[in-house]
Amino acid sequence: MAAAAVVVPAEWIKNWEKSGRGEFLHLCRILSENKSHDSSTYRDFQQALYELSYHVIKGNLKHEQASSVLNDISEFREDMPSILADVFCILDIETNCLEEKSKRDYFTQLVLACLYLVSDTVLKERLDPETLESLGLIKQSQQFNQKSVKIKTKLFYKQQKFNLLREENEGYAKLIAELGQDLSGNITSDLILENIKSLIGCFNLDPNRVLDVILEVFECRPEHDDFFISLLESYMSMCEPQTLCHILGFKFKFYQEPSGETPSSLYRVAAVLLQFNLIDLDDLYVHLLPADNCIMDEYKREIVEAKQIVRKLTMVVLSSEKLDERDKEKDKDDEKVEKPPDNQKLGLLEALLKVGDWQHAQNIMDQMPPYYAASHKLIALAICKLIHITVEPLYRRVGVPKGAKGSPVSALQNKRAPKQVESFEDLRRDVFNMFCYLGPHLSHDPILFAKVVRIGKSFMKEFQSDGSKQEDKEKTEVILSCLLSITDQVLLPSLSLMDCNACMSEELWGMFKTFPYQHRYRLYGQWKNETYNGHPLLVKVKAQTIDRAKYIMKRLTKENVKPSGRQIGKLSHSNPTILFDYILSQIQKYDNLITPVVDSLKYLTSLNYDVLAYCIIEALANPEKERMKHDDTTISSWLQSLASFCGAVFRKYPIDLAGLLQYVANQLKAGKSFDLLILKEVVQKMAGIEITEEMTMEQLEAMTGGEQLKAEGGYFGQIRNTKKSSQRLKDALLDHDLALPLCLLMAQQRNGVIFQEGGEKHLKLVGKLYDQCHDTLVQFGGFLASNLSTEDYIKRVPSIDVLCNEFHTPHDAAFFLSRPMYAHHISSKYDELKKSEKGSKQQHKVHKYITSCEMVMAPVHEAVVSLHVSKVWDDISPQFYATFWSLTMYDLAVPHTSYEREVNKLKVQMKAIDDNQEMPPNKKKKEKERCTALQDKLLEEEKKQMEHVQRVLQRLKLEKDNWLLAKSTKNETITKFLQLCIFPRCIFSAIDAVYCARFVELVHQQKTPNFSTLLCYDRVFSDIIYTVASCTENEASRYGRFLCCMLETVTRWHSDRATYEKECGNYPGFLTILRATGFDGGNKADQLDYENFRHVVHKWHYKLTKASVHCLETGEYTHIRNILIVLTKILPWYPKVLNLGQALERRVNKICQEEKEKRPDLYALAMGYSGQLKSRKSHMIPENEFHHKDPPPRNAVASVQNGPGGGTSSSSIGNASKSDESGAEETDKSRERSQCGTKAVNKASSTTPKGNSSNGNSGSNSNKAVKENDKEKVKEKEKEKKEKTPATTPEARALGKDSKEKPKEERPNKEDKARETKERTPKSDKEKEKFKKEEKAKDEKFKTTVPIVESKSTQEREREKEPSRERDVAKEMKSKENVKGGEKTPVSGSLKSPVPRSDISEPDREQKRRKIDSHPSPSHSSTVKDSLIDLKDSSAKLYINHNPPPLSKSKEREMDKKDLDKSRERSREREKKDEKDRKERKRDHSNNDREVPPDITKRRKEENGTMGVSKHKSESPCESQYPNEKDKEKNKSKSSGKEKSSSDSFKSEKMDKISSGGKKESRHDKEKIEKKEKRDSSGGKEEKKHHKSSDKHR
């Protein structure tokens, strides 16, 4: 009805009179145009009539309307009555079934209304007799039925009898004699036929009986086929065609009794008659038993039985009795299979196959379920025999092995049999088709199996070597496709049914190895996942294989590997896919099975090894398995077990690696890096290249030598017997062009792990995947570098610019891949030059080496320019960049110690061999020879490396002058060097970490122009927080190694004055005043002296401590883990200072307590480090031993300036300075003034005794003391708004414990002190009194300490290096400072209390910010670290500590009074101006605060708040940050104590941070700054006058 609704819509019926009738007529007219009975329009026409009639039956349309429209339609088609009768017939049946009276009545009315359209005769043919009776077409239906039966019986069933009485036996006797005579003479079938005709006529014989007799004789004389076929053909021309078939069918029926057995002769006669088309197969087929539906039932029953057997076999526990029962059942089943019931269809099929009638045989098999016929052994063997005969000529030509004779197969004499094949093309005709019907039952004929495989192997050789035309190629591709199908459907299933035939397996591999792995793996996949489910026999075999595999695996141990291995081998010959699938599932669950399983696989065939590779890949790619554990932080153990098994099995056995490598590559293409674990294991096991972060320093040192030293001393395990396996791995990579793609994919995937994969994954897992990806890249690259020949490597790896720009390879990875290529190139060029000019002089050799380097590296220098923006090359040259990235540790130094160690080991071995009395002499001699050869190799390698290193150093010596261009500041140069060279490479590998440290030292030793060693080390050590936080676990380990090597160098210089003087004394890297561009004068006064260097080293140690404590305090997993790893690595050289070590120890112990239950891995790391730290405690020294704390001599003065942009970080390294503008007389005066100023400050700040007088800024501070008193309240209000609670961070608390006995004036402010006292336990009264006394003593001591030296202004020195466009600004700044008074004398506190951050005036900060913004901010995190702000604040400052003789108390009081009176007058006048200044500053700060995200601001506040406390604890003179020249306006007096100091310090530090981020200022800010500068200059003039008047007074 659904289809009918499409033809006649319901709307037509509803609107029948209006439009429906017309629409229906129109539709019928269209459908009547095609008169054919086969077309779809004819069916639609029928459907339309049916639909119309059905609407009448349902009552939707009146029968008159229907009969009217049907009358109109009858004109359209002549066959309208017949169609309408068919429709009525269908409706008659439907309405009869419905049993609804109303519908039946409607139907009757419709038919009666249409009687004039359809004749009575037609209706009587097609309608039911009861319907005819109801319509009145017949009187009684019963009579009608009886009459029709009588007529049919008379027509079809009445027998025509022969007159048997007239037939005589003599006639039949003569007939048999005629047919049984000797037919070898000239007797022909025509002659015999004439005699038979005579006998029939003479003896009145029945022709049918004669035909039956002829068939009987034919059955008994099969050798005379041709005669009887000819006779029957002639005889049948006189009979009805059906007669012969009926007689034959009657014969078959005779044998269909329960115990009857059809003779084979009868099958043969029927087969021959079918072959010569004397009878039709369809006519005969109906006479044969069993029926097709019985065959189908039998087939289904076999499948059910097979599944029941599977269920029985998979039962978990069976007793021995049940096992016996099961064996008996198996025997019964076998018996059943051996005795099949008599099946006439199969008997005929066998006969057809024997006579070679393939066409009819095929027709019979098509009637049966797939492979049902072939599952009977006789049929299978018959098909096999037919194939043997058919392929014989081709096999003789291409398949017979050399030297083999073989037994030829005779061809069928039957001309109608399939033609024999002469070429591969002929196989398509019938042979492939025969195999398809044979299926898995080729297992019955192993000889034919081998023949087919050999023919296939020959075809594949021809196919692969064929260079013929396109047409021939297309034909051969079709044959290949057929061959693959036969392999899938016949060969592999047949192998499964063969009983462990290893020879067939090896024979099959001979053909399989010619297929590409894609074809092979597809075949294995079909074999494993589909083949076993399609055949009842294979279902059983699969269950039996799994059952047997379980039995073997349960008993497999290390002790019984051999016998179990043999059983595994035997089982694998036939069903490898099922066996390996089960074995791998067990390995994934129990990793202790890996070793015994690997050892037990030695008895497999080549085909089985290949199947194993496929099964491993399939197990790896299993989508149902989770690759992560439930905690989402670690890789699943099943994947780790499979990876380990992969590495072991691929190393031990000759398995094709192509598929596995391609799988890993495909996974990387898909952005999945889990499976890199497989590649890592395979390379490690097959090539012996280990990647581990736990290498000892001895191993690391050995890795810097040659290949022999690496193999002997660079790895944990001795690398043995990897030559063959590494060669196999190399061949697989090169043959399938996977070497470079894998490298590039890994290099790209490193970032993919973070940005694509890492979104939903746990950070810990992302880090592990990144490390795995990176480590595998390093390992794989190392394998390629050591195993590929120079030609192979150079041919595959493109140039550096192509790698980076086209393949988007990260620069570090690109250079890592290119580095061996450069070394190969240079080496080959050098050898060429040596051969061409045979000069033995060393100098000539060096010259040739340098020439070869220039030839190879010149294109590289050009290529690297495109890697970075042009501005980069203003700081460092492309040559320097390429040199850094192209060299390795092998080029820089010879590991003599390592060579010596390995040689000594060999000597010890040789001595042990000599002492061994049990060893046979032959073996002893052999071992000694091996050790001697190895020793000679090592010594030769060492010598070779020494010569190479000498050549490299000579080359570097010549190159160094062009390395660093003096186009920008040294600070920018160092930034680019660290950003583009050191930091990317130091975390690439452990050996690269050592290389980076040694390279920095080498650049220093070479006295490279424009390279500041001091700046470089300072930038590395100053703040490691962000670097450490952004590392993965392994990167942290490498970064730790890098810092360790850097600290080693620094410690060597620090520990001995002579070493320092020798290696650093007169080196440009340790200049502290960096003069005009390109000038590195050797002025001794510009060099950093030994004592000041020790101060700097202490500062670096302090910075490391501060960063470490910060990371430990964060609570972040990554921060804590990474800093603990780094600290563990640098333990040999840090901490050296006792108080820093104690601070670290306390924090680490706290981590141990906190993480014990929460994060066990952090707890383990912390405990490990804590234990090692305690063991190093005895080597730590007090601070005063680490660096000399007394004031150093004046001539050790130093300052570092960076020229233009000098506002960026530069270290305040010296403590003393030369005075450029004042003589001795001015110095004395300024000393007196600053002393008075200090006294005034101390008096004025009597209300706040906890203030730190060391923040005194200049001699004029005394004049501003009163003003500061008045301003104190305003400042406090500002401070409350800015920071309601003082920022104290955990590291401040950690370090604070070291300095409990420091005087109160060291506290940053009252709130800080209050917080610190809360954290401590309450003190007793005695302790408080003692504390007050100590404070008083310190106050008095402090009053005597005043600095007396004047500093060269920052702007003045900047002008020396500044470009002309910046000089106007510099002049303006200098003039302002001169007006303010150049006699600025920075005051230093006592050595015990270094001053916190200096306060910088607002215009000064803005000016600095402009200058900083003119230079790009380095991308590496160290350049934005907060601790570097200390360096920025202190740029271009000069410090000295000096103790003048104390004045008498009465004089002090007088001078203080006068100064205070005058300062009060001045302060009132300027109070209003300052109030405005403060408001503007406050507004500026709030604007800047908005620019910084709140979380960053908060963190910076905490860090800055800490600095106030932590700097007191450092006790290092280098840490004292002194005010700049422009600080007089803000720091007129420090009488307001530490509150003001810490507040201003916080502000200035925040401003510096913002400026270091490189943000641009608005025009509005610039206008404000200009206004402030004007006000400050006017204020400076007044100050100058005030200074003069105070001088006169004195």
From Swiss-Prot:
Chain location of the short sequence motif Nuclear localization signal per the record: 923-928
GO MF annotations, alphabetized: mRNA binding
Sequence segments annotated as region (Disordered): 1183-1594
Coiled coil: 896-965, 1464-1491
Compositionally skewed regions (Basic and acidic residues) per UniProt: 1183-1192, 1218-1234, 1265-1285, 1294-1343, 1353-1383, 1449-1504, 1524-1583
Residue span of region MIF4G domain: 535-686
Cellular compartments per GO CC: chromosome, telomeric region; cytoplasm; nuclear speck; nucleus; THO complex part of transcription export complex
Protein name stated in the entry: THO complex subunit 2
Biased composition (Basic residues): 1584-1594
Keyword Calcium found: no
Residues recorded as bearing Phosphothreonine in the entry: 1385
Region feature Charged domain, mapped onto this chain: 1175-1594
Stern domain: annotated span: 687-1174
Subunit annotation: Component of the THO subcomplex, which is composed of THOC1, THOC2, THOC3, THOC5, THOC6 and THOC7. The THO subcomplex interacts with DDX39B to form the THO-DDX39B complex which multimerizes into a 28-subunit tetrameric assembly. Component of the transcription/export (TREX) complex at least composed of ALYREF/THOC4, DDX39B, SARNP/CIP29, CHTOP and the THO subcomplex; in the complex interacts with THOC1, THOC3, THOC5, THOC7 and DDX39B. TREX seems to have a dynamic structure involving ATP-dependent remodeling. Interacts with POLDIP3. Interacts with ZC3H11A.
Renumbered residue ranges of the record's region Bow domain: 164-534
InterPro entries found in the cross-reference section: Tho2 (IPR040007), THO_THOC2_C (IPR021418), THO_THOC2_N (IPR021726), THOC2_N (IPR032302)
Compartments, record wording: Nucleus; Nucleus speckle; Cytoplasm
Gene of this entry: Thoc2
